[in-house]
Amino acid sequence: MEIGIVKWFNNAKGFGFISAEGVDADIFAHYSVIEMDGYRSLKAGQKVQFEVLHSDKGSHATKIIPIADTQE
């Protein structure tokens, strides 16, 4: 599993991109692979854990799990 930060996520379209250390290109993120209860969405700057699949269309995230901010 990789750890990354959400660069941006469009709730209306249901997708966005994640950046991760050691990965040159941004990683595509789709709402359908976000693992959480309720409305599945991400916010820019949010820390997430995920797996990466590589295809001819680029890298995309699977099994995206938001990481709770424990600094509150």
From Swiss-Prot:
GO BP, one example? regulation of DNA-templated transcription
**What PROSITE patterns has UniProt attached to this entry?**
CSD_1 (PS00352), CSD_2 (PS51857)
User: Organism's domain of life?
Assistant: Bacteria
What Pfam families has UniProt attached to this entry? CSD (PF00313)
Domain CSD, by residue range, is 4-64
Recorded GO CC terms: cytosol
Location(s) in or outside the cell: Cytoplasm
Report keywords, A-Z.
Answer: Cytoplasm, DNA-binding
Q: Molecular function terms in GO for this entry?
A: DNA binding; nucleic acid binding
Hydrolase in keyword set: no
- In its keyword annotation, does this UniProt entry include DNA-binding? yes
InterPro entries linked: Cold_shock_CspA, CSD, CSD_CS, CSP_DNA-bd, CspD, Lin-28_RNA-binding, NA-bd_OB-fold
**Protein name per Swiss-Prot or TrEMBL:** Cold shock-like protein CspD
Species of origin reads: Haemophilus influenzae (strain ATCC 51907 / DSM 11121 / KW20 / Rd)
Q: List the lineage, top down.
A: Bacteria, Pseudomonadati, Pseudomonadota, Gammaproteobacteria, Pasteurellales
